[in-house]
């Protein structure tokens, strides 16, 4: 057996019906498009969301919300990520050096997710209440 001799099992691949090839094919003449109308024409059909001229749903409903541009430069730091930083002092630069946050991040907040076992000094980051308690319980400090 070679790769060039492989073929699917007999009868496993059925050829698709060809349109416009006689009345006996079941898809002759109009080819399954019906008679006349926009959808029977070549290039016919309507865009997504078009409702025949009626005001479409996406325009009937009101606009809402926005995307804060600050969210693109803000990151959440898990407690478990603090152990990945070398030296025991955690700030924006050491987090970037450890590839925990991207270089475009300007603000970060430490949240209570995971565990911290080694004492660390958190400098210049915002810290949630639960994360603050966990860091101090592990013997760490928080410097504003």
UniProtKB/Swiss-Prot annotation:
Residues 1-54 are annotated as: Disordered. It comes from the Bacteria. Residues 21-31 have a biased composition (Gly residues). Keywords: Ribonucleoprotein, Ribosomal protein, RNA-binding, rRNA-binding. Part of the 50S ribosomal subunit. Belongs to the universal ribosomal protein uL15 family. This is Large ribosomal subunit protein uL15. The gene is rplO.
């Amino acid at each position: 057996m070679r790769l060039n001799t492989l073929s699917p099992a007999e009868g496993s691949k059925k050829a698709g019906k060809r349109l416009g090839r006689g009345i006996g094919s079941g898809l002759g003449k109009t080819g399954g498009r019906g008679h006349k109308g926009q959808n029977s024409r070549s290039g016919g059909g309507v865009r997504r969301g078009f409702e025949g001229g009626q005001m479409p749903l996406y325009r009937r409903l009101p606009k809402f919300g926005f995307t804060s541009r600050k969210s693109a430069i803000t990151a959440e730091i898990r407690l478990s990520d603090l152990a990945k930083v070398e030296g025991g002092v955690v700030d924006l630069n050491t987090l970037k050096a450890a590839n925990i946050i991207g270089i475009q991040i300007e603000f970060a907040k430490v949240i209570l997710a995971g565990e911290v076992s080694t004492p660390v000094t958190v400098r210049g980051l915002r810290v949630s209440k639960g994360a603050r308690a966990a860091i101090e319980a592990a013997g760490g400090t928080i410097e504003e």
